[in-house]
Amino acid sequence: MILLLAGTSDARALAVQVKKAGYDVTATVVTDNAAIELQRAEVKVKIGRLTKEDMTDFINEHGVKAIVDASHPFAEEASKNAIGAAAETAIPYIRYERASQAFTYDNMTMVSTYEEAAEVAAEKKGVIMLTTGSKTLQVFTEKLLPLSDVRLVARMLPRLDNMEKCQQLGLPQKNIIAIQGPFTKEFDRALYKQYGVTVMVTKESGKVGSVDKKVEAAKELGLDIIMIGRPKIEYGTVYSTFEEVVHALVNQTRS
């Protein structure tokens, strides 16, 4: 069996590809919605966040031969847990990650953390749109909501827990954009104009995450961009295509 951390839409497509290559695959996802397309493709699914101990137990109980970590580029804890579990059980760890993109824009500020992004946003002021999801929303609400010269607008997935979190953090309903992509450049541009955005905050999650569309639209309107770089994790070899992952599995799981 292969344990595959499927934290993104392309990761779930990878799980299907690995199954088609003849492997018994169990994919891990965090939400019920993420499990649906995998279940339709008859891929076994385990729902919920796994600790290192959870992964280690699963590996031992099910005779897992390798971990394929296709979690989101910013799912730092999940990757560290997978690396630790693979090391503890002496099985191969294979990392799949969306290819990075290089952007050139005078009004783009690169930062390393969400906290740093919030600091820069506070300095820039104006109408700030977050496209970084709900997980780290509190970092921005604590820093930006008290400022009278800042309007904080947050775009996130239309999930009940996200709306509840916005309410708990005091983000006004009129400043919540609950919607699911992917989005075109034209859509992003219209959204920026509708809200009068002056600063867009995003993270370098790759082309599949439509970061390029967000950036292109922002550049056309002359907006300031704050880009959060990917976490620095020692993955070892990183593969960016499905074919490379399957080839690595073939080479590393031979008896």
Swiss-Prot record:
Keyword Oxidoreductase tagged: yes
GO molecular function: precorrin-6A reductase activity
Superkingdom assignment: Bacteria
Record carries keyword NAD: yes
Listed pathway(s): Cofactor biosynthesis; adenosylcobalamin biosynthesis; cob(II)yrinate a,c-diamide from sirohydrochlorin (anaerobic route): step 7/10
Enzyme Commission code: 1.3.1.106
Single GO biological process annotation from the record: cobalamin biosynthetic process
Keywords for this protein: Cobalamin biosynthesis, NAD, Oxidoreductase
Pfam families: CbiJ (PF02571)
PROSITE patterns recorded: COBK_CBIJ (PS51014)
Catalytic reaction list: Co-precorrin-6B + NAD(+) = Co-precorrin-6A + NADH + H(+)
NCBIfam families for this protein: precor6x_red
Family: Belongs to the precorrin-6x reductase family.
Function in brief: Catalyzes the reduction of the macrocycle of cobalt-precorrin-6A to cobalt-precorrin-6B.
Name of the protein this chain belongs to: Cobalt-precorrin-6A reductase
Gene transcribed to yield this protein: cbiJ
